[in-house]
């Protein structure tokens, strides 16, 4: 082979492999919104029971970004995986290299029968561009550009069922500046418009304030867009027991009209590794949140499938379940194959 041709092939092969991951259409059927439900295009109702990955960038750096990681989720009973993309990791790795990671993850997930949420994993106030920690720093321009890029790339791949527009909006009681619900609603509508302009029909997931817990404003001012679902992160310490009536008042009522996904739930004991507010509780929380989700047809995703981030689901890379891991592995197994 001539040296010039060989050099050209060496340049093109990584690009072609990356593009093939994005364009490979797996056997999963596209999910869409129908009233307050998720349904596939062939009419099957979907209620998701999933697991949160840690950031693909972190997993790749530690040597654990591999198909078997997602296969273990499938063995636990998951039908959905959430990929949290930290803005800092997106910038440090670079868009093209990070997209190559997502291409791999989406391809593996599709092969395993797992749907995907791509989550822009920031915490703070996108209006003022002030954040809880430097790792979450982003700008509106960067956020909008991220969703334009991701939407264009995965619009034809039904494995990617959801785009979670912003992980946890919060003003931290004014420490991050002010943002009203109408202002936050308008920012989400802008993001959805950018996504739709690419031709993507992927379902946007919209979170409310108080670290994605509170959806009370949706009652009177829902997002002005079709095919949208809403998010809550009802960790156990957000409210005191008994939880159920408070959950209904704060976010559960939304499920009467729109689909709801609890994209982060989980717990750990007060003496468990990584215990922190708002996740400290016990199995009674697991019983309550899973029963509530089952009763109301609400989807959920447990945080987090990693032995370092908390509340962790396993303690080592043999996937030895932690306390909450044992609980949710058993809970998810009830849904496997449905």
What are these regions (language model features)?
Residues 7-15:
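Bacterial N-terminal signal peptides
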Residues 17-21:
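Sec/Tat signal peptide C-region and signal peptidase I cleavage site
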Residues 98, 128-137:
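Aromatic- and acidic-residue-enriched carbohydrate-binding clefts of CAZyme catalytic domains
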Residues 22-80, 209:
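N-terminal carbohydrate-binding accessory modules
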Residues 55-57, 87-91, 124-126, 169, ...:
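Feature marks short, surface-exposed loop/turn motifs that line or immediately flank catalytic pockets
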Residues 30-31, 62, 135, 141-162, ...:
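Extracellular glycoside hydrolase catalytic/binding regions
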Residues 65-125, 187, 191-198, 282-296:
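Aromatic-lined substrate-binding rim segments of carbohydrate-active enzymes
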Residues 1-4:
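Positively charged n-region of N-terminal signal peptides that target proteins for export
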């Amino acid at each position: 082979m001539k040296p010039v041709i060989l050099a050209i092939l060496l340049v093109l092969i990584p690009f072609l492999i990356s593009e093939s991951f994005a364009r490979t259409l797996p056997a999963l059927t596209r999910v869409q919104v129908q009233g307050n439900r998720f349904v596939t295009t062939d009419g099957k109702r979907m209620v998701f029971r999933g697991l949160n990955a840690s950031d693909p960038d972190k997993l790749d750096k530690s040597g654990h970004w591999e198909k078997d990681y997602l296969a273990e989720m499938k063995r636990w009973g998951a039908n959905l995986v959430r990929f949290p993309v930290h803005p800092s990791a997106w910038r440090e790795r670079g868009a093209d290299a990070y997209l190559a990671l997502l291409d791999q993850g989406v391809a593996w997930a599709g092969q395993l029968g797992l749907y995907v949420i791509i989550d822009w994993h920031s915490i703070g106030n996108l209006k003022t561009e002030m954040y809880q920690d430097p790792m979450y720093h982003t700008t509106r321009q960067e956020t909008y550009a991220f969703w334009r890029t991701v939407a264009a790339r995965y619009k034809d791949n039904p494995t990617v069922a959801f785009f979670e527009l912003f992980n946890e909006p919060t003003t931290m009681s004014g420490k991050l500046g002010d943002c009203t619900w109408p202002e936050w609603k308008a920012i989400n509508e802008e993001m959805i418009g950018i996504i739709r302009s690419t031709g993507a029909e992927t379902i946007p997931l919209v979170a409310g304030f108080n670290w994605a817990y509170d959806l009370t404003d949706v009652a009177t001012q829902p997002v002005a867009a079709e095919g949208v679902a809403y998010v809550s992160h009802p960790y156990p310490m957000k409210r005191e027991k008994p939880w159920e009536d408070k959950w209904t008042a704060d976010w559960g009522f939304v499920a009467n009209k729109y689909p709801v996904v609890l994209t982060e739930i989980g717990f750990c004991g007060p003496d468990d590794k990584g215990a922190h507010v708002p996740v400290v509780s016990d199995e009674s929380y697991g019983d309550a949140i899973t029963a509530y989700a089952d009763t109301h047809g609400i989807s959920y995703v447990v945080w987090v499938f990693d032995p370092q981030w908390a509340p962790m689901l396993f303690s080592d890379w043999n996937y030895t379940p932690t306390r909450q891991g044992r609980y949710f592995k058993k809970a998810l197994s009830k849904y496997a194959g449905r």
